[in-house]
Amino acid sequence: MISRDRVRATLNQQEPDRVPMMMSASGWVIKRLKQRLGVETDRDLHRALHLDVFDTRGFDYKGAIGPKYIGPEEIGIPSDWRGDLFKVFGYHEEIIENAYGKSSAMGMPCVGVDEYPTVAELETYRWPQADWFDFSEIRSQIEPWADEFAIACTGCSVFQHPTLYRGIEQLLLELHAEREIATFIIDKVTDFYLDYFGRIFEEAGDLIDIFRLADDIGAQNNLFISPSNLDEYLAPRVRRCADLAHRYDIKLLFHTDGNVRKAIPDMIEWGVDILDPIQPEVPDMDAETLKREFGDRLSFSGGVGAQEILPRGSVEDVRAEVQRVIDILAPGGGYILAPGHPSLQMDVPTENIIAMFEAGLEYGRYPSDCT
């Protein structure tokens, strides 16, 4: 069974030949993996780890393939731009060094309250437009990957990226006290993404399997956005994303870290098909309960702890955890094996990453004792 058929089967709550697998990681982690496995290209790394999903933004979310940028030169987008949407919005990257090496973080905000205190000032900002891109070659870029892997089209956000624009504390305040400003910023980001990805789907929607929406709404112990704000700000916009994806028979993946147990029924109502990730270290997000309560209506990815097991456990610990998670989540389909945080960082030993996917290949075969 090829990867695309494997992924589509599991996302339709069917059992394929084995549990599909996917991963993202920082650039430094990817470099380390390639060196250890003796491969040079991203394609070869996918093959070496038996990964089934190719992300159009690449392993590190900085862009692998994308439409050609033809917008204003003064924005500073290079001619070889390949899908790093953070650059389009004006975020700047900060390099951080610690005991594990170097990593990067997004600088923020772009439209701070001091410079853009009202909607009138916000209207003067040069918001990105889908017309800044030439989508005519996007199909030819995706086709070579779609022959071998399921395709995840990522980069969309209706809440998290607006918090980067404004600063998370400021936008959370404005959700309550300055609703006009919050709505304006959220709609600017949402409208751009729906237009941008709508044009990609128009060109190559039949090649795409997953539309990934990244909108962190959970902290370690609970939601950090109120139910009323979920209803007002996220629900209508996530539904628009789901409607766009489903128009092209694409599954909508909703990424959020943290304890989001209370919001899962809402996500299903919004049209979400996949919750990413299951983060086992947080309360109320144990795989067994989630599978039992929502597994007939929702698929899952993640589940292998990226806070404890992967960075601090032994290879044997990782293998045992992978087997445990597969035994719980794999029956009946609806599960993609992945870390409990989708982007692995430098604190995770290379041997543990390799062990995770080797164990997935070994224990994830159907039919299994757990089915």
What is each stretch, according to the model?
Residues 20-21, 33-38, 58, 84-90:
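N-terminal capping/small domains of soluble enzymes
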Residues 57, 79, 256:
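Aromatic-residue-lined binding/catalytic grooves and analogous aromatic/hydrophobic interfacial grooves
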